[in-house]
């Protein structure tokens, strides 16, 4: 498998996993959705806001070289409907971006400033892998918070995504 094929598979997984978390979050009451649970961004709502903010900000870095909207501003998106809309838009833009990639672009180095303004540079494939891994971390925190509320969600392991995808290919 090439780097490009791997990145495409990881971004398919990332979108699927985000959608499963959003679907599970839709079964929470408003209180449960915003309840402080001790996760990095306090609540299911906060974690989802952070995940989508990171996706949007990294995409902006990759396409324009800068953050057009500060992470803190994007994280102010509140309510499941608004978050769902933000995720849908970020997934659409990420699909377009991933479709435009080639191996040369993935191996290319991108200079950028992080959310604290620190300058760094990394190969695109590392940055893109980071975004998926970052989302996995915060989805796991979200799953833990939901389990603590007695509302566990489905397995989000990558292998289950591939098993489901293989089944869909056979069935359909």
What kind of region is each of these model predictions?
Residues 1-10, 34:
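Short, charged, low-complexity loops and linkers
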Residues 11-23, 27-73, 114-172:
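Short, contiguous alpha-helical
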Residues 3-6, 78-79, 94, 126-128:
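A ubiquitous short alpha-helical element
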Residues 7-10, 44, 83, 106:
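Hydrophobic side chains within well-formed alpha-helices
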Residues 9-20, 85-89, 93:
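A non-catalytic, amphipathic alpha-helix used as a structural packing/dimerization or gating element
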Residues 3-4, 30, 55, 103:
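Alpha-helix initiation and N-capping motif
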Residues 65-106:
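Helix-adjacent hinge/juxtasegments
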Residues 103-115:
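Carboxylate-rich helix-loop segments that flank metal/cofactor sites and access channels
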